[in-house]
Each structure stands twice: as C-alpha cells, then as structure tokens.
C-alpha cells in the first residue's frame, strides 16, 4: 500500500501545472538607470511535463514579442538622442545667440534626421519640445540683429566730429562755442572737406591761365563776306528774280480747273463706251512722267469723292472706273451712306515702271494740252 500511494503521489505531482515565477523583490532590485539595455520580457511558462522539456526547445517564443522588443530599443535610443541634443543646446545657448556661427542650423538638421525615425507620440513630444526651444533661440537672434542695425547714437557722432575738427565740448559751454570765431568754423569745415575728399573720387577743377587781367567777352565781328558775295552777284547780273508780292486771288483755282477737265475726259469715254468700264491704271498712268501720274491720281480722287464715278475691283482683282447714274450719284453725295469707303493709294517709282510695263501703256489718256 505504501508503494502504491507513493506512485500516485508522484503521478499527481507530474500532472500539476508548474510555473516559473520571478519574485517581486528580485524584480525591484534591478537598477532603474539601465534604460539603455534592451527590455526583457519575463515569461511564465506553463509546463505540463517534466523540467527536461524546457531545455528541449518545445516552448517557442512569439515573434511579435521580439519585434516589440526591437521597436522599444529603437524608440529608447531616439529619446536618448533627443535629450542629449536639447542638453547641448541649453549648455551652448549663449554662444548660439551671441555668435554668428551655424550651431542652431546644425542642431535643426540633426533633429530632422532623428524625426525620420519617430513613430510614437512620446518621441514626437520630444521633437516638439526641441522645436519650441529652437524657435526661442531664433527669435532672440533676430532681435539682436535688428537692434544692431538700427542703432545710431547721434550725440556720440556729433562729439566725434567736434573732436576730429579740433573742437571739444568739455573745454567750455555750448553757448561759448556758438560765439566762436569764423576762422575756427572755417578750419573745422576745411578739416571735414579734407577727410571727405579722401573717400570720394573726384577730378580736380580746371582753371584757365589768362594772366593778371580779367577775362571779358570779345565783341562780335561783323560778317563782311556775305555782303561781298551779294555785291559780286549784282555786278555780274546773276541775281534771281525777286518775288515782290504774291496775290493768290489773281490766279484761278488750278485744282478745280484740272478736276473739271479730267471729269470731262472721263464722261466722254463713258458716252463713247457706256458698257465698258475703264481701267484705273490705264486712265491715270502717264508713261512719260511719274509726277503727272501722281497728279492724275490726286485729281481722280476728287471725282470719286463727289460721286461722278466709282472705283471697284474686277474679276482679276484690278481697280476699274465706271460711271454712276443719277440715283447712285444722289446716294454718293449723301454723307450717311454706309457703302462709301476710303482708301489710300501708295505708288513708288519702281511700281510705276512695273505698271507701265505690265499694262503696256504707251500713251496717256489724260492729255497735256490744257496744262
């Protein structure tokens, strides 16, 4: 019976669940400063067999626990670097604000590198804390820069000028200096001029050397050459005819007369050939004179303006002159007519020669007899 009880007791002990437990006193004894060491997970292994099964590797650890351990180590390293960076900035605060180095810029670049690995709120809070510190330092540097640029002590500058010019406020009262001799003031401004000219590039003034007399403008000499030439021309009889008086009222209006003459030639052609319009270029072009051609164009423009004829383009897109009946003439004289158009004709000497050759114009339609 004793043997059976012992065997049952052994079996009961094997069937019980055994736990590997770490006492709380031993856990509390771990140093809190060892923050840089990787976090260790205390796992309670539930064993149903003997203790030899633990060493055989049958109890596997979850890979997620290993990943969490690695992430915790990375985050702890980032926090440590952030704290170290803020500590260095606090220690060098005076040098960063008062000097012109790039310490603040380098610290911001280092913080940007650390921020690339931030994935949790705790590290992001440290980054925000560092940014607040950096912004305060930047504000202090900006205030110091503005104060240095805008600072100008007017009184100190005036004292420096007086000392440089040989005057000193400490030698007497300001009222005494206001009544100083003109020679002292002149010497002061001469000293200022001498110093200022050394900083300015300026050419020396040019002075003429005329001797001891005072320069006076010379009297203008009368021009006798022109009078001599006029006398010679009068003696030789080469003087042009002088125009005593121009009386325009004694001459008839040449433009109106020429327009009426050309209108008569045009109406004669229309009566002879009522159904055949005349070519504009053949009518106005004078193959022997470019100036006469320009005058003919000028006179024909009055005929078209008054509505005695009109200009249009034929099938070849060339200008032609054709007569107008009584109704069309009334419409042409009406200033409110919407069909009236104005144009500008330009004609060069080369274009005149080309037109004469192209149209084979050998004789002018507008004769010269009445000129």
Swiss-Prot record:
It is found in: Nucleus; Cytoplasm; Chromosome, Telomere. GO terms for biological process: DNA recombination; DNA repair. Pfam families: Nse4-Nse3_bdg, Nse4_C. One of its GO terms (cellular component) is Smc5-Smc6 complex. It comes from the Eukaryota. Keywords: Chromosome, Cytoplasm, DNA damage, DNA recombination, DNA repair, Nucleus, Repressor, Telomere, Transcription, Transcription regulation. Its main location: nucleus. The keyword Zinc-finger does not apply. Belongs to the NSE4 family. Tissue-specific component of the SMC5-SMC6 complex, a complex involved in repair of DNA double-strand breaks by homologous recombination. The complex may promote sister chromatid homologous recombination by recruiting the SMC1-SMC3 cohesin complex to double-strand breaks. The complex is required for telomere maintenance via recombination and mediates sumoylation of shelterin complex (telosome) components. Acts as a repressor of nuclear receptor-dependent transcription possibly by interfering with CREBBP-dependent coactivation. May function as a coinhibitor of other CREBBP/EP300-dependent transcription factors. Component of the SMC5-SMC6 complex which consists at least of SMC5, SMC6, NSMCE2, NSMCE1, NSMCE4A or EID3 and NSMCE3. NSMCE1, NSMCE4A or EID3 and NSMCE3 probably form a subcomplex that bridges the head domains of the SMC5:SMC6 heterodimer. Homodimer, and heterodimer with EID2. Interacts with the C-terminal region of CREBBP. PANTHER family: EP300-INTERACTING INHIBITOR OF DIFFERENTIATION 3 (PTHR16140:SF1), NON-STRUCTURAL MAINTENANCE OF CHROMOSOMES ELEMENT 4 (PTHR16140). This is EP300-interacting inhibitor of differentiation 3. It comes from Macaca fascicularis. The lineage of its organism: Eukaryota, Metazoa, Chordata, Craniata, Vertebrata. The gene is EID3.
């Amino acid at each position: 019976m004793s043997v059976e009880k012992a065997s049952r007791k052994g079996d009961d002990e094997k069937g019980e669940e055994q736990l590997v437990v770490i006492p709380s006193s031993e856990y509390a004894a771990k140093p809190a400063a060892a923050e840089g060491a990787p976090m260790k997970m205390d796992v309670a292994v539930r064993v149903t067999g003997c203790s030899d099964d633990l060493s055989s590797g049958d109890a596997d650890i979850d890979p997620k626990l290993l990943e969490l351990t690695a992430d915790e180590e990375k985050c702890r390293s980032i926090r440590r670097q952030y704290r170290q960076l803020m500590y260095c900035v606090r220690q060098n605060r005076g040098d960063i604000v008062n000097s012109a180095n790039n310490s603040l810029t380098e610290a911001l670049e280092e913080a940007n590198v650390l921020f690339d690995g931030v994935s949790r709120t705790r590290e992001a809070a440290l980054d925000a804390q560092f940014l607040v510190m950096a912004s305060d330092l930047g504000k202090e540097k900006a205030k110091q820069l503005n104060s240095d640029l805008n600072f100008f002590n007017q009184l100190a500058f005036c004292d420096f000028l007086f000392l440089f010019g040989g005057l000193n406020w400490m030698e007497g009262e300001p009222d005494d200096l206001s009544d100083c001799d003109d020679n002292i003031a002149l010497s002061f401004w001469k000293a200022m001029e001498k110093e200022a000219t050394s900083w300015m590039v300026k050419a020396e003034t040019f002075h003429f050397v005329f001797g001891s007399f005072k320069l006076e403008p010379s009297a203008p000499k009368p021009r006798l050459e022109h009078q001599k030439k006029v006398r010679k021309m009068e003696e030789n009889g080469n003087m042009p005819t002088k125009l005593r008086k121009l009386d325009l009222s004694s001459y008839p209006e040449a433009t109106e007369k020429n327009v009426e003459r050309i209108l008569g030639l045009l109406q004669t052609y229309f009566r002879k050939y009522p159904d055949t319009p005349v070519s504009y270029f053949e009518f106005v072009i004078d193959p022997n004179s470019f100036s006469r051609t320009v005058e003919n164009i000028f006179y024909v423009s009055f005929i078209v303006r008054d509505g005695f004829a009109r200009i249009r383009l034929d099938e070849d897109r060339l200008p032609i002159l054709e007569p107008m009946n009584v109704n069309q003439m009334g419409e042409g004289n009406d200033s409110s007519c919407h069909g009236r158009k104005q144009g500008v004709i330009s004609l060069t000497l080369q274009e005149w020669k080309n037109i004469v050759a192209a149209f084979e114009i050998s004789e002018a339609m507008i004769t010269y007899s009445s000129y």
